[in-house]
Design a protein with these regions (language model features):
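Leu/Val/Ala/Ile-rich N-terminal alpha-helices, chiefly Sec-type signal peptides and the beginnings
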Residues: 1-47
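Acidic/His metal-coordination segments adjacent to aromatic residues that form catalytic metal sites
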Residues: 3-23, 86-119, 187
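Residue-level recognition of alpha-helical structural elements
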Residues: 18, 48-52, 109, 138-142, ...
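Generic structural signal for well-ordered, non-transmembrane alpha-helical segments
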Residues: 23-30, 57, 61-68, 114-125, ...
Length: 197
């Protein structure tokens, strides 16, 4: 489908495009909330990974709150069901499946490594790319969440790497899940939905 005349190279989003992005961000943060929450409360020996459980519980709380902030920014319009906008993005392919595999892992250390080394940096890249082309006039409230999410995400990556470095001294977890996420995200560093038009 060609672009309408006069829209070539436009740097703005329609309300429908922005709504789809915010819905995808909400879905993404909800999935992170669910996965990290499951690690924090899942079965297994508590003493062996107590510090990791505390860290994943904090991550779950942060991403749950972020999902709530995205949900607050979904448009309220006649004929548009806001909850229906919360859906997995079309790209990258395999994202929903990668989250299912991440959630199904029985080894919290393996999952946390994939989360810290691949998922969080990718999410930060998506948010950063959106910020680069966002317009304050029409996306001011969205930009505020993006800025906060990137700042907190960077701190979360640093604390996660520090924790995993201390915990993995006893034994290096396999990279299987990290590789899965890298394959899911490799073709495109940023979700194609971030780019307008």
């Amino acid at each position: 489908v060609g672009e309408p005349a006069g829209d070539e190279g436009r740097a703005w989003r329609t309300i429908d495009e922005l709504a789809a992005l915010v819905g995808a961000y909400c879905w993404l943060e909800q999935r992170i909330f669910e996965v990290t929450g499951a690690w924090a409360t899942g079965p297994g020996p508590v003493d062996e990974v107590a510090e990791l459980r505390v860290w994943t519980a904090a991550a779950s709380r942060r991403h749950g709150a972020l999902a709530g902030r995205w949900a607050e920014r979904l448009p309220v319009r006649a004929g548009v069901e806001a909850a229906a906008l919360v859906a997995a993005p079309e790209g990258p392919r395999g994202l929903a499946e990668a989250f299912e595999e991440l959630e199904a892992t029985k080894e919290p250390m393996v999952g946390a490594c994939a989360f810290v080394e691949t998922v969080l940096p990718w999410v930060g890249g998506v948010y950063g790319s959106h910020l680069e082309i966002a317009t304050p006039v029409s996306e001011g409230s969205v930009m505020a969440v993006l800025v906060e999410a990137r700042r907190e995400g960077s701190a979360e990556i640093r604390s996660g790497r520090s924790l995993l470095g201390r915990l993995s001294e006893a034994g290096k977890p396999s990279g299987h899940l990290g590789d899965q996420f890298k394959r899911a995200f490799a073709p495109e560093r940023v979700s194609p939905a971030v780019r307008p038009g």
